[in-house]
Curated annotation (Swiss-Prot):
Protein name as annotated: Phosphoribosyl-ATP pyrophosphatase
Gene transcribed to yield this protein: hisE
MF GO annotations: ATP binding; phosphoribosyl-ATP diphosphatase activity
GO cellular component, one term: cytoplasm
HAMAP family, alphabetized: HisE
Originating species: Hydrogenovibrio crunogenus (strain DSM 25203 / XCL-2)
Disulfide links within the chain: none
GO biological process: L-histidine biosynthetic process
Annotated family: Belongs to the PRA-PH family.
Source organism phylogeny: Bacteria, Pseudomonadati, Pseudomonadota, Gammaproteobacteria, Thiotrichales
EC numbers on record: 3.6.1.31
Length: 113
C-alpha cells in the first residue's frame, strides 16, 4: 500500500485547521473539539463493525471497505487534532513489523511497568 494518499490527507487535514467551519466539514469538527471528533470516530467504528457482520452474511465487502475508509478518515482527523499524523502511526507499525503479537504485547507490558 502506498503511503502517498495518507501523506496527502495529512496535508489537507492540517490545512483545514485554518479554514472556515461554515465551508469545511473537517474545520467544523476541529472547531467543535475533541469530544465531537471522538464521537465521530466511535460512530464510524460501530458502522465498521456492522458492515463487517453484513459482509460476512452477504459475501459482499463493498460497504465494509467504504466504512473502513470513513473510520480511517475520522481517525486521521483525530490524529491531526492531537498534533499527530499518519507518519506517527506508520512509524509505530514499522517498529512492530516482524514481531509476533505476543512479543509486541510483552514489550508493551515491560514498558508500561
Amino acid at each position: 500500500m502506498s503511503n502517498d494518499i495518507l501523506l496527502q490527507l495529512d496535508k489537507i487535514l492540517d490545512a483545514r485547521k485554518t479554514e472556515s467551519p461554515e465551508t469545511s466539514y473537517v474545520a467544523s469538527l476541529y472547531e467543535k473539539g475533541l469530544d465531537k471528533i471522538l464521537k465521530k470516530v466511535g460512530e464510524e467504528a460501530t458502522e465498521t463493525v456492522m458492515a463487517a457482520k453484513d459482509a460476512e452474511y452477504t459475501q459482499n465487502n463493498d460497504n465494509l471497505v467504504y466504512e473502513v475508509a470513513d473510520l480511517w478518515f475520522h481517525t486521521l482527523i483525530l490524529l491531526s487534532h492531537q498534533g499527530l499524523s499518519s507518519t506517527d502511526i506508520t512509524n509505530e507499525l514499522q517498529k512492530r513489523f516482524g514481531l509476533s503479537g505476543h512479543e509486541e504485547k510483552a514489550n508493551r507490558s515491560k514498558n508500561d511497568a
